[in-house]
Amino acid sequence: MDLNLRKAIYSNISNNDEQQLEATIVDAIQNGEEKMLPGLGVLFELIWKHSDDQEKKEMIQSLESGVKQL
């Protein structure tokens, strides 16, 4: 069976507005279930692909800061 996770996630969120997308992200993080990690990864990939260099730099800096707090 060939499951294309990206396509499934894109299909699930394709009609979502900003509030629904935010709720999806917040719920996945607060829930803390590992099964949600691939979905968050796909969402991050979309964000990354649609960000300019400055936004990417800010995300990396934020990530570095968060990693240092672990």
UniProtKB/Swiss-Prot annotation:
The record's annotation in InterPro entries points to: SspI (IPR017525)
Keyword line: Sporulation
Where is it mainly found? Answer: other
Domain of life, per UniProt, equals Bacteria
User: Which residue ranges does UniProt annotate as crossing the membrane?
Assistant: none
Location in or out of the cell: Spore core
Q: What induces it?
A: Expressed only in the forespore compartment of sporulating cells.
One short Pfam family name for this protein? SSPI
A Gene Ontology BP annotation from the UniProt entry? asexual sporulation
For this chain, the family text in UniProt reads: Belongs to the SspI family.
Which NCBIfam families did the record assign?
Answer: SASP_sspI
Question: Which HAMAP family does this entry report, sorted A to Z?
Answer: SspI
Name of this protein? Small, acid-soluble spore protein I
- Organism for this UniProt entry: Oceanobacillus iheyensis (strain DSM 14371 / CIP 107618 / JCM 11309 / KCTC 3954 / HTE831)
Gene symbol here is sspI
